[in-house]
Regions:
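Conserved donor NDP-sugar-binding/catalytic core segment of glycosyltransferases
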Residues: 1-33
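Short, flexible, basic/aromatic active-site loop/helix in glycosyltransferases
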Residues: 20-26, 37-59
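A recurrent flexible, glycine/aromatic-enriched loop bordering the glycosyltransferase active site
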Residues: 48-72, 84-85, 91, 133, ...
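Juxtamembrane C-terminal module of membrane proteins
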Residues: 148, 152-155, 178, 182-210
Length: 210
């Protein structure tokens, strides 16, 4: 895994980072397995600023679950931001891309990593995701995320129908609704009372440090 990530960075001039493909663990739920394959396909890719129209918000995607960075580019672009409730890896990758570097998705570097989040957990997680985007407009402004989320829902629905897992459709609707509700509120956290923010967040310690 490490060798493939290092090769992905070293063999692609201007690559500031490379991240691995995440495979579902044995206990991973059916719907989450599809989400893994949607977010981490079999084909590798190299993403740069020229790919914004093609990939949208996914151009900036990078996951610290398993990733390697070019030290020189990492330091030159400022490394990880000091304050981020979530998405520090994506903020770092987005900064690199905006400064003319690229990020590699190395599908041949594989790790097992997945979650079986409940709807409530998805709400909290996506609230923090929305907060991170609201706090870093220099990265996310003008690159909407909603379209990618809608595409995932549509693809997931089609997959459930094709495979005959109709009874999971209500779960898809519930989980997707909770994701969007959390994200919607997180993007607008500045308008919310502190008590509401603390009830919505997955990371109360972050707000206690603000």
């Amino acid at each position: 895994v490490i060798g493939n990530l290092v090769c992905a960075v070293s063999e692609n001039p201007g690559a500031g980072a490379a991240y691995a493909r995440q495979l579902p663990r044995a206990d991973c739920r059916f719907l989450e397995r599809y989400t893994r394959s949607f977010n981490y396909p079999e084909q590798s890719s190299v993403k740069s600023l020229a790919d914004i129209d093609k990939y949208g918000i996914k151009t900036y995607f990078c996951s610290n679950v398993c990733a390697a960075y070019d030290k020189g580019i990492y330091l030159k672009t400022g490394g990880f931001t000091e304050r981020a409730i979530f998405n520090e890896d994506m903020i770092c990758a987005g900064t690199m891309i905006q400064k003319g570097y690229s990020v590699v998705y190395a599908a041949d570097a594989r790790v097992y990593h997945s979650h079986n989040y409940s709807g409530k957990q998805q709400f909290h997680r996506n609230f923090d995701l929305g907060v991170s985007q609201a706090e870093h407009p220099e990265i996310f402004e003008g690159v909407p995320s909603e379209g990618e989320g809608i595409r995932l829902v549509k693809r997931s629905l089609g997959y459930l129908i094709r495979t005959g897992h109709f009874w999971l459709i209500p779960q898809l609707i519930w989980q997707s609704g909770m994701k969007y509700a959390g994200y919607f509120l997180g993007k607008r956290y500045r308008k919310l009372p502190r008590k509401v923010v603390l009830a919505c967040t997955m990371s109360p310690y972050y707000w206690n440090r603000k």
